Amino acid sequence: MTLILGIDPGSRITGFGVVRDGGRGCEYIASGCIRTGSGSLPERLQAVYRGVTEIIRSHGPVTMGIEQVFMARNADSALKLGQARGAAIVAAAEAGLEIAEYTATQVKQAIVGSGGADKRQVQMMVMHLLRLVQKPQIDASDALAIALCHAHHRQSLIPHGLDGARRRGGRLRL
């Protein structure tokens, strides 16, 4: 059984989700949001780093899936998102976690079956797959979807010795 951390990065709200992959489906462990407040960007990035570090310490995942940066309409927003991703990746790398990155389309395809699914469709499918009674917050739901996507990809890659994945900078590119 493998504990998987999913991260939906953001400079103001970073969603997280932890699931246990037992090979025949995943079990919900925890989810929530790291809210960084209205401080300066360095303070918010530090809050993301510390929050992810605490989640790793509390739950002990061995691997992490994180969403890749998408092309935002605003270049400044994309840069801040990339910096928040970096803070989360450094926290995971320091803890020795295996890190894999997924596009939003890959996550939606793995969870809903359509790369064009909206956030509510993803949220409802996450609830169904993890047998949740209450709706998780949207950012937490996205993070749980990333964790589930990572579990799915790990299952499909393990029998092949991760031959289908490329390592770049210590991270798996799928």
UniProtKB/Swiss-Prot annotation:
It catalyses: Endonucleolytic cleavage at a junction such as a reciprocal single-stranded crossover between two homologous DNA duplexes (Holliday junction). One of its GO terms (molecular function) is magnesium ion binding. PANTHER family: CROSSOVER JUNCTION ENDODEOXYRIBONUCLEASE RUVC. Keywords: Cytoplasm, DNA damage, DNA recombination, DNA repair, DNA-binding, Endonuclease, Hydrolase, Magnesium, Metal-binding, Nuclease. GO terms for biological process: DNA recombination; DNA repair. Mg(2+) 2 binds at residue 67. Mg(2+) 1 binds at residues 8, 139. Its EC number is 3.1.21.10. Binds 2 Mg(2+) ion per subunit. Pfam families: RuvC. The RuvA-RuvB-RuvC complex processes Holliday junction (HJ) DNA during genetic recombination and DNA repair. Endonuclease that resolves HJ intermediates. Cleaves cruciform DNA by making single-stranded nicks across the HJ at symmetrical positions within the homologous arms, yielding a 5'-phosphate and a 3'-hydroxyl group; requires a central core of homology in the junction. The consensus cleavage sequence is 5'-(A/T)TT(C/G)-3'. Cleavage occurs on the 3'-side of the TT dinucleotide at the point of strand exchange. Homodimer which binds Holliday junction (HJ) DNA. The HJ becomes 2-fold symmetrical on binding to RuvC with unstacked arms; it has a different conformation from HJ DNA in complex with RuvA. In the full resolvosome a probable DNA-RuvA(4)-RuvB(12)-RuvC(2) complex forms which resolves the HJ. This is Crossover junction endodeoxyribonuclease RuvC. CDD domains: RuvC. It is found in: Cytoplasm. It comes from Azotobacter vinelandii (strain DJ / ATCC BAA-1303). Its main location: cytoplasm.
